[in-house]
């Protein structure tokens, strides 16, 4: 019997709710079978579009959603009772889901019919994406509230998507992906169990609603074996740790986006082949096949994909699902000695690392003591070193670099660009929204939200009330900040200089030593991340490399204002300021830093 195809998505959203809605309708008309919403950084980090930290970030890497009016526009003409919607949202996941539910209630749609997923994995935010806001304990409380609320009110909703995807994007090895992601899942489920609001049978069903979001890299056999190991280990953990009896509730359910870290700016047309090969690893093995797949576009190393670029990735999925005979056969790898041995070894190694994390107190302790972050920073450094040394071949980057001019990028930059007016228009619309809403309703809703946050009352009902009253993203988050506080995650950077035999590094180190001797002190290098971009692995690797070259490095983590960076540079008397900005806001933010420096 032929299997049904996986859910086919493209990760999309930019500029405004209106433009993103047009993009969604266009993609759905081409055969996409689910939505995957990308939010801009202010929305992800809980700021309204007019906040100082939102400057330059509005609409850049996703769609800005400040209130229920924006959500109405975003999902206009999209039937919520028929759509499977994935939202890549974490610290503010409870709020964005509340807006979604409030819109469904407004349209008289039965909550039982809402299908979708909120990513809602805050532990990996501390480790990779950097959109966390609150400390671990209250963050896990918010996740627990969402899990128990959706179990009772939205039975078809996946409240948490445990993400190993982002761990691979910052350098995790396959065994680290397995162990870190499973430790994260256990941390969330343990918190739900401790809340003691569900019966044993209800908790077993909650376990069955946990889903995962994984990565698939270019090492095809290893990645496929990793997925089979995930299936076995999750069955093992849910059975032995939680006593889940029903095999359906022990099933490893996952969606995937294939690797973006390996997409290259050089010869970007080669990325099409990388994307296809990486996808094969998660769809060929029937017993470990993804339930949903979204593919990056070939040009994501260059910038924001255009509609045509997204269509190309969509067609790739459709050809594999509908033209090939892949879905007509049982698992192709059952009985393979090579596969079985590889899977078993990965399970042994992953259990060892998982148990090590549990012995230190679990994933949250591993965040707080920086163990998990340091492991990822070190793994990523090893990966980069292998590429720099030529041990790991990347076609077009360190081998086969000669190329003809690509017709795909010959006539323009080959990417979508965001109109600079978007931010001003969004701020103007936000001010109009505030002016025209019923402030009495807003004040009442915020008061109830504060009461819920300060008590053990589930946060979701008060959040839905706030959404219906017209509360904004920034206002909801400010309540949580006031009650829970904020958290700056460890950077994972150490000043331990590691010996290298790379000639380029050794040459730079000689020059650093010579200049330092001449000036009477070590070259001091401040690495700053202004704005809201939390993808810190680039900055971390620059910090590690600069330290290895003999510089004194100052790196204070993510989400700094231009004024804070300039203040630190003066107080620390640095020689060099380096900036890492991956959200497309570099021109504006660099300009602001230069202006601040001139004032001093």
What is the predicted function of each stretch?
Residues 3, 50-54, 80, 124-126, ...:
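Short acidic (Asp/Glu) and glycine-rich catalytic loops that position anionic groups and cofactors
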Residues 31, 67, 108, 234, ...:
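Conserved, mostly hydrophobic/aromatic
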Residues 539-600:
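Cofactor-cradling patches in redox/metallo enzymes
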